[in-house]
């Protein structure tokens, strides 16, 4: 039995996520698709726009077989810790492959980056100019898009495993706020808060009132 794993937030679930599920199944030829999904809190430290149970239900309705929760301690961390927590769960689930989206969609290049460590000389040079360690580390990664950074983090976490990585081309930019059929989750969230109709980008029935209600629980 072939098992494929994906790592998700679904904040909210949209057409791009549906494409990811379809491609993961097609490219891996898996019998079972497992999604590791953030719970009620997501990587940027905010509460998810929709509760985890509704998001998991929608994932199963759209092609995922099993949804496993990524614990809060990993879900709200940096890319490397987020990825390590998710990959550890998928390793325990005995997956054969993982499938993720990336902007470059070049596994060879991403793997080469994953095989290297931080350039300490550049890091020290950036810190000597007055940057803090987190800012200096961020500047070293500034030329990489968000999903490429996550992809490298997944590949680092997969080191010394037999799990095969599959990359698919991300069809939009995370920071793109244009609402189209394949729109970023960020664009959809902004549109909801602006009282816009988001049905072109997501089949998830999300109301402005739901999102405003959840905002009161943001940390």
Name these PLM-found stretches.
Residues 1-55:
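N-terminal catalytic cores of NTP/NDP-binding nucleotidyl/phosphoryl-transfer enzymes
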Residues 6-7, 36-37, 68-70, 166-169:
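Short beta-strands and strand-loop turn motifs
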Residues 8, 42-43, 59, 73-74, ...:
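Short, contiguous strand/loop micro-motifs
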Residues 25-26, 60, 87-91:
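Non-catalytic positions within long, well-ordered alpha-helices that form the structural scaffold/packing
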Residues 28-31, 64, 95:
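Short, high-confidence coil segments that cap the C-terminus of an alpha-helix
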Residues 57-71:
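A glycine-rich helix N-cap at a beta->alpha junction
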Residues 70-219:
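Active-site cores that bind ATP or allylic diphosphates and position pyrophosphate for catalysis
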């Amino acid at each position: 039995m072939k098992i494929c794993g994906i790592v998700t937030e679904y904040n909210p679930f949209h057409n791009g996520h549906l494409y990811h599920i379809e491609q993961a199944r097609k490219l891996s030829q898996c019998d079972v698709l497992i999604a590791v999904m953030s719970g009620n809190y997501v990587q940027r430290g905010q509460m998810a726009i929709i509760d985890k149970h509704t998001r998991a239900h929608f994932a199963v309705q759209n092609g995922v077989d099993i949804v496993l929760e990524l614990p809060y301690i990993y879900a709200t961390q940096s890319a490397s810790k987020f990825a390590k927590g998710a990959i550890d769960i998928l390793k325990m689930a005995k997956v054969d492959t993982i499938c993720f989206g990336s902007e470059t969609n070049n596994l060879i290049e991403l793997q080469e980056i994953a095989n290297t460590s931080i350039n300490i000389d550049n890091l020290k040079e950036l810190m000597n100019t007055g940057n803090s360690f987190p800012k200096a580390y961020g500047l070293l990664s500034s030329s990489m898009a968000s999903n490429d950074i996550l992809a490298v983090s997944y590949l680092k976490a997969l080191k010394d495993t037999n799990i095969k990585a599959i990359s698919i081309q991300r069809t939009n930019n995370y920071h793109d706020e244009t609402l189209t059929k394949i729109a970023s989750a960020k664009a959809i969230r902004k549109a909801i808060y602006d009282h816009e109709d988001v049905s072109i980008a997501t089949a998830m029935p999300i109301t402005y009132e739901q999102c405003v209600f959840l905002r009161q629980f943001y940390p």
